[in-house]
């Protein structure tokens, strides 16, 4: 039935729909923007922690993280130091967001197609193996070799931040490649943590975690849409992992991977629901003497339709990512980057080789592994370089991938129980990350030109499919 002029949609009526389109079409641009800006916050938090730890008030810094915090009441109370709640509690949310990113990439991103994923997978694997081997070549003793996983990690916030400083020199396809590489690197780090940096498995704990995961699946099956309903079963998964001897942050990854990638509403369902609600708003506003509170229900329906038109994985990532980037990660850096630099803290016999192994692993091993693995895969014909990206661009990605920082510090905390060895590993991470950032900037300025190469992908949308050659 044809609408009368009074029923035609007024300008701005579809503003919610436009906002949804922007959120669906531009997730990578926003992701890169948040990551680049959060790198500055991370840097400030780390600098403050390092300065405080080496000041006359350094003991207060150490004591702060041992303050006991209790959650729960009575027999259900659980008491742990503040440092635990940051590293094992809040970091679970970080790993949950990482799980969401991985889930999206597998469904619709660079990891959804094997040919597109081949290059970033090869680069990431090479960038993990080479640093680990370089570290082990310098740390063969049982006391220090357990830290081989430390130089494998890449901090996506700092890496993307360095690329952002290079401005228009960096082609969009190179940014997408770095993003995909970093996500695969996260997958590798998660596997390493689960397999090599967790204590002996207690099967009863795994059964508890499996029960929590099953509850999540049941809620999804019955169409429960409120995120709050999933907090309790998610906490059960976390508790089960902790009791099982598996690092509890893995629970965040597991729940992230279980998050639905399809929206509750299809596009047609959203249009129908929104149109019906808009028609009701139009009818109410045309009626004399209508009350403002009568608009609450149809406007609420529009908001609900807008919310449910987005897949849960997209909506949760958009909601949590800024909190993780600007809150959890800087807090983690502040709690873990405060390394006291003196003879007593670095006096362990193995400290020197640990520091050297971590530093060289990130600064030299990362770019070498990324470049050689990419070169081998392209020469073997398994994949092709993205449009507009040359070998100089791959070298730049390898350099900035050596910025390990937060994830490397996280693994160091799992690898070393000795305070001096942990301090050496953290210092190596901080030193290597600073050097890798400077080298990445210098190589980027020298190797990348401001003009796009012929046939280069000019937008992120083009860049996402540019490896399908």
Curated annotation (Swiss-Prot):
Alphabetical keyword list: Antiport, Cell inner membrane, Cell membrane, Ion transport, Membrane, Sodium, Sodium transport, Transmembrane, Transmembrane helix, Transport
Cellular localization per UniProt: Cell inner membrane
Listed transmembrane segments: 31-51, 82-102, 118-138, 147-167, 176-196, 199-219, 235-255, 319-339, 353-373, 394-414, 423-443
Catalytically driven reaction(s): Na(+)(in) + 2 H(+)(out) = Na(+)(out) + 2 H(+)(in)
A GO cellular component entry from the record: plasma membrane
One Pfam entry name: Na_H_antiport_1
Membrane topology: Multi-pass membrane protein
Presence of the UniProt keyword Ribonucleoprotein in the record: no
Chief location category: membrane
InterPro entries: Na/H_antiporter_dom_sf, NhaA
Gene Ontology terms, MF aspect: sodium:proton antiporter activity
GO BP of this protein: regulation of pH
Family, per entry: Belongs to the NhaA Na(+)/H(+) (TC 2.A.33) antiporter family.
HAMAP family, alphabetized: NhaA
Role according to the record: Na(+)/H(+) antiporter that extrudes sodium in exchange for external protons.
Protein name: Na(+)/H(+) antiporter NhaA 1
Lineage, top ranks: Bacteria, Pseudomonadati, Myxococcota, Polyangia, Polyangiales
Encoding gene (name): nhaA1
């Amino acid at each position: 039935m044809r609408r009368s002029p009074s029923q035609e949609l007024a300008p701005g009526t579809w503003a919610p729909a436009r906002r949804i389109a922007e959120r669906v079409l531009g997730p990578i641009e926003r992701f890169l923007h948040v990551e680049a800006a959060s790198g500055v916050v991370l840097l400030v938090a780390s600098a403050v922690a390092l300065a405080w730890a080496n000041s006359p008030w350094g003991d207060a810094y150490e004591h702060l993280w041992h303050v006991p915090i209790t959650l729960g009441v009575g027999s259900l109370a659980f008491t742990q130091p503040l440092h635990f709640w940051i590293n094992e509690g809040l970091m679970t949310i970080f790993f949950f967001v990482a799980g969401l990113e991985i889930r999206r990439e597998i469904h619709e991103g660079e990891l959804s197609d094997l040919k597109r994923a081949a290059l970033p997978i090869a680069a990431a694997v090479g960038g993990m193996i080479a640093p680990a081997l370089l570290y082990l070549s310098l740390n063969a003793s049982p006391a220090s070799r357990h830290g081989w996983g430390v130089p494998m990690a890449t901090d996506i916030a700092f890496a993307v931040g360095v690329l952002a400083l290079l401005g228009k020199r960096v082609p969009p396809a190179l940014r997408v490649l770095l993003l995909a590489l970093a996500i695969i690197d996260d997958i590798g780090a998660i596997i390493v943590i689960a397999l090599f940096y967790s204590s002996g498995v207690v099967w009863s704990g795994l059964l508890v975690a499996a029960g929590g995961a099953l509850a999540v699946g049941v809620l999804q099956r019955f169409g429960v849409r409120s995120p709050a309903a999933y907090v309790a079963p998610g906490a059960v998964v976390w508790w089960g992992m902790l009791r099982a001897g598996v690092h509890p942050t893995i629970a965040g990854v597991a729940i992230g991977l279980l998050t639905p990638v399809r929206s509750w509403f299809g596009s047609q369902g959203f249009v129908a629901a929104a149109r019906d609600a808009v028609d009701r708003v139009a009818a109410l506003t045309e009626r004399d003497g209508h009350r403002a509170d009568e608009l609450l229900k149809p406007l609420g329906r529009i908001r609900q339709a807008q919310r449910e038109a987005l897949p849960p994985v997209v909506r949760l990532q958009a909601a949590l990512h800024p909190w993780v980037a600007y809150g959890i990660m800087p807090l983690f850096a502040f709690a873990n980057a405060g390394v006291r630099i003196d003879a007593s803290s670095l006096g362990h016999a193995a400290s020197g080789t640990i520091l050297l192994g971590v530093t060289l692993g990130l600064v030299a091993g990362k770019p070498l592994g990324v470049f050689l693995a990419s070169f081998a895969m392209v020469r073997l014909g398994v994949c092709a370089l993205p449009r507009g990206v040359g070998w100089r661009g791959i070298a730049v990605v390898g350099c900035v991938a050596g910025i390990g920082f937060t994830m490397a510090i996280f693994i160091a905390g799992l690898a070393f129980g000795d305070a001096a060895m942990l301090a050496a590993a953290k210092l190596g991470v901080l030193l290597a990350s600073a050097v890798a950032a400077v080298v990445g900037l210098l190589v980027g300025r020298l190797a990348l030109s401001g003009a796009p190469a012929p046939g280069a992908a000019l937008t992120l949308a083009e860049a996402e499919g540019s490896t399908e050659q």
